[in-house]
Amino acid sequence: MKEGIHPKLVPARIICGCGNVIETYSTKPEIYVEVCSKCHPFYTGQQRFVDTEGRVERFQRRYGDSYRKGR
């Protein structure tokens, strides 16, 4: 490997929205995520709807019931 071209790795904490903290190494000291293996439905086995940033609500506001009536 060439000297001086690789980013410096530091101990990092990955912090999930559910409160889970994962210790690892990265170029950033803290990384924030919305879901992790402790709360994601695929890993927990629970049927749960994951809505990021209110996309369903935004769609409902924009189109409302007119979307369903056209079908």
From Swiss-Prot:
Example of a GO biological process term: translation
Cofactor binding note of this UniProt entry: Binds 1 zinc ion per subunit.
Gene3D superfamilies: Ribosomal protein L31
Cofactor: Zn(2+)
Binding annotation for Zn(2+): C16, C18, C36, C39
Annotated Pfam families: Ribosomal_L31
Molecular function GO labels: metal ion binding; rRNA binding; structural constituent of ribosome
Keywords of the record: Metal-binding, Ribonucleoprotein, Ribosomal protein, RNA-binding, rRNA-binding, Zinc
Record GO cellular component, one term: ribosome
InterPro entries: Ribosomal_bL28/bL31-like_sf (IPR034704), Ribosomal_bL31 (IPR002150), Ribosomal_bL31_A (IPR027491), Ribosomal_bL31_sf (IPR042105)
NCBIfam families xref list: L31 (TIGR00105), PRK00019.1 (NF000612), PRK00528.1 (NF001809)
Family recorded in the similarity comment: Belongs to the bacterial ribosomal protein bL31 family. Type A subfamily.
Complexes and interactors: Part of the 50S ribosomal subunit.
PANTHER family, per database record: 50S RIBOSOMAL PROTEIN L31, CHLOROPLASTIC, LARGE RIBOSOMAL SUBUNIT PROTEIN BL31C
Xref: HAMAP family: Ribosomal_bL31_1
Function of the molecule: Binds the 23S rRNA.
Protein name in the entry: Large ribosomal subunit protein bL31
Source organism of the structure: Thermus thermophilus (strain ATCC BAA-163 / DSM 7039 / HB27)
